[in-house]
Regions:
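Conserved substrate/cofactor phosphate-moiety recognition/catalytic segment
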Residues: 2-42
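Anionic group-transfer/hydrolysis microenvironments
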Residues: 13, 60-61, 67, 104-106
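A short acidic, often aromatic-flanked loop/helix-cap motif at beta-alpha or helix-coil junctions
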Residues: 17-18, 155-161
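Surface-exposed cleft-lining segments at the edges of enzyme active sites
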Residues: 18-29, 66-75, 112-116
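Glycine-rich phosphate-binding loop used to anchor ATP phosphates in small-molecule kinases
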Residues: 31-95
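A glycine- and Lys/Arg-enriched "phosphate-lid" helix/loop adjacent to the NTP-binding pocket
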Residues: 73-136, 140-158, 171
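Short, hydrophobic alpha-helical segments
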Residues: 167-175
Length: 175
C-alpha cells in the first residue's frame, strides 16, 4: 500500500526486536516493544508531514502490542501504564487513525518462529482484535471521529485491491 500510494509507512517493531534479542520475549520486554512501536509510528508521521503526504501507513499499531502482550505475556493494565500509555484502549481510541484494515484469517496459517505459535491462537487473537475494533468503533462514535474498519479477505490480490479501494474511499471522504 505504501508503494502504491507513494506514502511513508511504519513496520511492526516487535519483529525486529525479537530478531535482535534472539530469544522469546518476556513481560519485561513489553515496555520496550510498545515504546518502539510508538516511535516508528511517530517517525512515519513525521516523514509524511515533511513530504506533505496526506497518507501514512502503519503495518500495525499498539493495539496489536496490547492484544499480543495480553495473550502471550499476560501483560496487565499495570504493564500498559508502565509502558507510558495510560489506559490502553483510551490511547488507541484517541490515536489519529482514520482507517483500520482488518485482515481476516481466511488464508492458511504458517508458523513464524518465535511469533504466532498456532492456528488456534490465531483464531483466538482474531476474535480479540474483532472485539477491540468494535470497542474502538463505539469510542469513535461517541467522540465523533471518522475512524472506520474495513474487512480484508481473500487471495493476496483480492486483499490488495480491497485495501486500495478502502484507502481511496477514505481519501474521497476526507476531500
Amino acid at each position: 500500500l505504501s508503494d502504491h500510494f507513494h506514502a511513508p509507512h511504519s513496520k511492526e517493531y516487535v519483529r525486529s526486536f525479537v530478531d535482535s534479542i534472539n530469544r522469546p520475549i518476556v513481560v519485561s520486554d513489553f515496555c520496550k516493544i510498545v515504546q518502539g512501536q510508538v516511535a516508528l509510528e511517530k517517525e512515519a508521521c513525521l516523514q509524511a508531514r515533511q513530504q506533505t503526504c496526506k497518507l501514512v501507513f502503519h503495518d500495525t499499531n499498539i493495539l496489536s502490542n496490547l492484544i499480543y502482550g495480553s495473550h502471550y505475556l499476560e501483560a496487565s493494565a499495570k504493564d500498559i501504564e508502565t509502558a507510558g500509555l495510560g489506559p490502553g484502549i483510551g490511547f488507541i481510541g484517541q490515536a489519529p487513525y482514520d482507517l483500520y484494515l482488518f485482515c481476516q484469517n481466511d488464508i492458511p496459517w504458517k508458523p513464524e518462529g518465535r511469533q504466532r505459535d498456532s492456528a488456534q491462537a490465531r483464531d483466538h487473537l482474531h476474535e480479540q482484535f474483532a472485539q477491540s475494533l468494535t470497542n474502538i468503533s463505539a469510542l469513535n462514535a461517541t467522540n465523533a471521529t471518522n475512524a472506520k474498519t474495513v474487512l480484508i479477505h481473500g487471495s493476496p490480490e483480492t486483499r490488495l485491491n480491497l485495501a486500495i479501494n478502502a484507502v481511496q474511499a477514505c481519501l474521497e471522504t476526507e476531500a
